[in-house]
Amino acid sequence: MPKNKKEWLTAIYRILLVLLGTFLVAFGNVGFLAPLDVNAGGLNGIAIIVRHFVKDESMKLLAYNLVVDVAAVVFWVIGLIFIGKEFAIKTLVASIAFPVATWFFSACPGVAGLTAKLGELITYTGNGPTAGNFLMAAIFGGVFVGTGVAITFVGGGSTGGVDTLVFIFEKYLKIKQSIAAFIVDGSIIVTGLCVLLPSDAAFLLPCLSGIISSFVSSACIEFIYIGSQTSYQVDIISDKWEEISKYVQNEIGRGTTVIPARGGFHGDDRIILRIVFNKNEYDKIRSYIATIDPKAFVTYTRTNAVFGEGFKSHKTENIFTKKRKKDGRK
């Protein structure tokens, strides 16, 4: 529980990010993917498969929303049982907000109006939607879903849903999250293909579009979430290491580490200057080194996350990372 005003404000900020991300995911599903049966996995894919068996057209939307509701609750309970209370708390907000957002956008006429204006992406006209309609729906849907998931991650939460299976696979089968996510979403897409394609060959296009949407979504998550965490570690061997160190400390505001080393070729004593900085400072440091010592030997290594003074607090570390450390895995 938050202990002071600052911690309360931080908690509220993170909850708002999770809510924003969840609503973006729901908007991408309801506004772009679901109307054209674009199955990109997740709860949306499960709901699309189930509503296929509902013959009454007037009941399909209700069936879609009910499946999302039930599945969200079921996966949350599964997470509570097999992963633990910490995971359940982490996904509680999204597990409640996602079904609510799905109902909201389903009932909101503005969503249909907006998507219809974007090249009639979800409107069946003439002989039906063209391949271009499916492609645009897959791209826009993937962008909204991927952006929403990334924002949820930035808020320190999780979208829940089928992600629960991903963490279960990681915990019990020791499968990496990226591979587990591919298996889970891939299984939903293939299931949709097997269920829908025999009844209507036209379902091949939305299923293939779902694969495209899944890649777009992953790219957005990589760009927004992973990209926002990117920092650099640089090792510098230079006769001007003292000047470089002072510049970094005084102008950039970063600390430096001086590491004694010995050259393997000549056997002379050298200094390796190590600096860790974020991507926004990359150009300044690189330009300064090139100016003061063009012959400096420099190696840049990109890191996905840095914890400690001047960077992220250890307290904000994701609970799933903590679990892996406790298990002795990296």
Q: Which residues fall in each region the model found?
A:
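Positively charged, small/polar-rich N-terminal and surface patches that mediate targeting and assembly
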Residues: 172, 178-194, 201-212, 218-330
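Core subunits and conserved enzymes of cellular information-processing
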Residues: 2-240
